[in-house]
Regions:
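Amphipathic, interaction-prone secondary-structure segments
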Residues: 83-105
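Interface elements of modular peptide-recognition networks comprising either
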Residues: 106-109, 136
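Repetitive, compositionally biased segments used for assembly/scaffolding
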Residues: 94, 100-101, 108-113, 122, ...
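Low-complexity, glycine/serine/proline-rich disordered segments
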Residues: 1-75, 80-83, 88, 114-120, ...
Length: 138
């Protein structure tokens, strides 16, 4: 004799009754209001200034600035540590990838790489180096 549905395990991992699956539809463009007040996006879809084959954002503390930029641009993405352990990777549902590396081939210049997969993004694929204001790189 069955007691019927009690709801005791509703919402738990094994529950199939009334389960809901949230679908992540976040895009990198959703984060522009968080990013652009401090890091303006130009009309071509780039952050920072033009550098040698990269974009450049200058600050008094490049590591902290790169972390702040990265944290503002990645909400809604799936995070993972890079296989080599030298950075983190954020992947959005549309396949857009943002990578943050503290150590790069340019000394004291952390980097954020943005690889856009959406055709209608306001942001262009780019690599941004964060450099210290007032150095020979400035």
């Amino acid at each position: 004799m069955s007691k019927g549905y009690s709801g005791l395990f509703n919402g738990t991992k094994g529950s199939n009754h009334n389960s809901q699956t949230a679908i992540n539809t976040a895009t990198i463009d959703d984060n522009l209001p968080l990013v652009t007040p401090k890091y303006p996006l130009n009309s071509y879809g780039n952050f920072g200034e033009k550098g040698k084959n990269v974009r450049v954002i200058k600050s008094t503390n490049p590591i902290a600035t790169s972390q702040d930029f990265y944290n503002k641009i990645i909400p809604g993405a799936k995070l993972e540590i890079l296989a080599n352990g030298k950075g983190t990777k954020a992947t959005f549902p549309d396949g857009t990838v943002v990578v943050h590396r503290i150590t790069t081939s340019t000394p004291n210049s952390p980097a954020v790489s943005i690889n856009i997969k959406s055709n209608n993004s306001k942001i262009k694929s780019q690599k941004i180096h964060f450099i210290k204001k007032g150095t020979h790189n400035d």
